[in-house]
Amino acid sequence: KKLDADVHVLMTQNATNFINPITFETLTGNKCLVDTFDRNFQYSVEHVSLAKKADVVMLAPASANVIGKIAGGIADDMLTTTVMACRCKKIIAPAMNTNMFENPIVQDNLKKLEYYGYEVISPAVGYLACGDTGAGKMPEPELLLEYILKEVAREKDMRGLKVLVT
């Protein structure tokens, strides 16, 4: 928002256990969408409308669950239905326990997403929420922003840019 981007945040129901959607609504000035069938908006097919507006999608933090759903073509919530409808660049930042991140199934799903054009940002190494230390930490927000700016090839000026953050 500070860079004049129109930022929309989508969350899974599970993500609301970690942070309240109101936080993102306050920061972006846009409704944070969780429920695919939320009726508190002017009628439109919301996930398709958002997908058409987005210039870039940043999936951060991306859980093993979300990665698996998208890699498997599962679209069963606001986040996954919107991502499936997007034709813009998609950037994904996995964040999870090291053992989960290194699991061959998760690695195969990330390779599959790369094959389909997703850019995967390697997780940071450090102290994780579970108490372990290792790869799996979400990269710093400044690094995520660098990836977005690189994609849109604009230095600090995001005026008119539509960014979808999940």
Set out the residue ranges of the language-model regions.
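A cross-family phosphate/adenosyl-ligand binding-site feature
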Residues: 1-90, 97-166
